[in-house]
Amino acid sequence: MVYLQKQDKEVFDAIKLELGRQRANIELIASENFVSEQVMEAMGSVLTNKYAEGYPGKRYYGGCEFVDIVEDLARDRAKKLFGAEYANVQPHSGAQANMAVYHAVLEPGDTVLGMNLSHGGHLTHGSPVNFSGVLYNFVEYGVREDTKEIDYDIVREAALKHKPKMIVAGASAYPRKIDFAKFREIADEVGAYLMVDMAHIAGLVAAGLHQNPVPYADFTTTTTHKTLRGPRGGMILAKAEWEQKLNKSIFPGIQGGPLMHVIAAKAVAFGEALQPEFTTYCEQIIRNSKKLAETLQAHDVTVLTGGSDNHLLLIDLKPLSLTGKAVEKVLDEVGITVNKNTIPFETESPFVTSGIRVGVAAVTTRGFDEVAIEKVGVLISEVLHNIENEEVLADVKARVATLTNEYPLYPSL
């Protein structure tokens, strides 16, 4: 960043501080990851200069012959990665991918069945503060109070009762596998479209470690970061028959020009995900997640559902008389980054919460194995059981620094 350092030291300094934070902290936010240097290079390329409204071979601007190559690579790699007939890599985010699907097949006021946000769903699955809840009549399904897992009989009952035009499966804070085949059966029974939002688990799906929703869903949406370890962005996968409608829904429906530098980075990330090393990485994610859950529970920390099948876990803080807001702050002070999170049947406000969400995708990228992640679990539990003990917190902070120093991040930057 030689030019930036010379021209705009304020921005340069802020970026360097953020790099220092990422290096020094144990990153456990489930929606975050560390992209490769080559993904960052693509993001910072001259492709950021190019307007390319439309699609490869059908642009509204001249001079698109080379960005066409990049977008075709991204689409082809995405289709290969997930076994899809159609891919649209232009959505700027997962939220816009979801919006485009809704825009393509729903009318304002249509009924949609989606997962309750506090039970693990997402804002774009019908939250009243989100466009989805404003434009469409969302009705909810959730998890059982005893198991904290999805009960497909209850989902079916809700579908039969409300007769939705679409069912949305997928979650932002659900630690167990989702059975997309069962969702397909329910959707077929009521004549509904099925959209799966696999944003959090896309990398695990690509690695064959979670059921692939593409064969079951009419529409599959995802972000391209999180476990897929690409740039921040979105994508839609579907059968070829939906190409024209979905393409129009993205452009000119809800977006203008695509971000060609981001699409290039998506292509690079998809190429990485097609390599055997990526499967090895995702297998380590699962091992780390299970080890973290096991370690926390061994130290009297309540993990919802008793464990995890993916990259994340939810910790219930009520037995410790703590709030997510307080724990997030104290953990951050000792160098462990998490986010406060609502838990099913929440009694606190979304700004306070009774839980935290913890994910291992980023630290696994960094090289953490089961031995390292067990240390992380011990550190978290020590904080939770000694949240006002300054001596313990200082000791944890020092051990966090020792651990992160053992796993250097971006040494060439």
Swiss-Prot record:
<keyword id="KW-0808">Transferase</keyword>
<dbReference type="GO" id="GO:0019264">
    <property type="term" value="P:glycine biosynthetic process from serine"/>
</dbReference>
<feature type="binding site">
    <location>
        <begin position="121"/>
        <end position="123"/>
    </location>
    <ligand>
        <name>(6S)-5,6,7,8-tetrahydrofolate</name>
    </ligand>
</feature>
<comment type="subunit">
    <text>Homodimer.</text>
</comment>
<keyword id="KW-0554">One-carbon metabolism</keyword>
<dbReference type="InterPro" id="IPR015422">
    <property type="entry name" value="PyrdxlP-dep_Trfase_small"/>
</dbReference>
<dbReference type="InterPro" id="IPR015421">
    <property type="entry name" value="PyrdxlP-dep_Trfase_major"/>
</dbReference>
<comment type="pathway">
    <text>One-carbon metabolism; tetrahydrofolate interconversion.</text>
</comment>
<keyword id="KW-0663">Pyridoxal phosphate</keyword>
<feature type="binding site">
    <location>
        <begin position="349"/>
        <end position="351"/>
    </location>
    <ligand>
        <name>(6S)-5,6,7,8-tetrahydrofolate</name>
    </ligand>
</feature>
<dbReference type="InterPro" id="IPR015424">
    <property type="entry name" value="PyrdxlP-dep_Trfase"/>
</dbReference>
<keyword id="KW-0963">Cytoplasm</keyword>
<comment type="pathway">
    <text>Amino-acid biosynthesis; glycine biosynthesis; glycine from L-serine: step 1/1.</text>
</comment>
<feature type="site" description="Plays an important role in substrate specificity">
    <location>
        <position position="225"/>
    </location>
</feature>
<comment type="function">
    <text>Catalyzes the reversible interconversion of serine and glycine with tetrahydrofolate (THF) serving as the one-carbon carrier. This reaction serves as the major source of one-carbon groups required for the biosynthesis of purines, thymidylate, methionine, and other important biomolecules. Also exhibits THF-independent aldolase activity toward beta-hydroxyamino acids, producing glycine and aldehydes, via a retro-aldol mechanism.</text>
</comment>
<feature type="modified residue" description="N6-(pyridoxal phosphate)lysine">
    <location>
        <position position="226"/>
    </location>
</feature>
<dbReference type="InterPro" id="IPR019798">
    <property type="entry name" value="Ser_HO-MeTrfase_PLP_BS"/>
</dbReference>
<dbReference type="GO" id="GO:0035999">
    <property type="term" value="P:tetrahydrofolate interconversion"/>
</dbReference>
<dbReference type="InterPro" id="IPR001085">
    <property type="entry name" value="Ser_HO-MeTrfase"/>
</dbReference>
<dbReference type="GO" id="GO:0004372">
    <property type="term" value="F:glycine hydroxymethyltransferase activity"/>
</dbReference>
<dbReference type="GO" id="GO:0005829">
    <property type="term" value="C:cytosol"/>
</dbReference>
<comment type="similarity">
    <text>Belongs to the SHMT family.</text>
</comment>
<dbReference type="GO" id="GO:0030170">
    <property type="term" value="F:pyridoxal phosphate binding"/>
</dbReference>
<dbReference type="InterPro" id="IPR049943">
    <property type="entry name" value="Ser_HO-MeTrfase-like"/>
</dbReference>
<feature type="binding site">
    <location>
        <position position="117"/>
    </location>
    <ligand>
        <name>(6S)-5,6,7,8-tetrahydrofolate</name>
    </ligand>
</feature>
<protein>
    <recommendedName>
        <fullName>Serine hydroxymethyltransferase</fullName>
        <ecNumber>2.1.2.1</ecNumber>
    </recommendedName>
</protein>
<keyword id="KW-0028">Amino-acid biosynthesis</keyword>
<dbReference type="Pfam" id="PF00464">
    <property type="entry name" value="SHMT"/>
</dbReference>
<dbReference type="InterPro" id="IPR039429">
    <property type="entry name" value="SHMT-like_dom"/>
</dbReference>
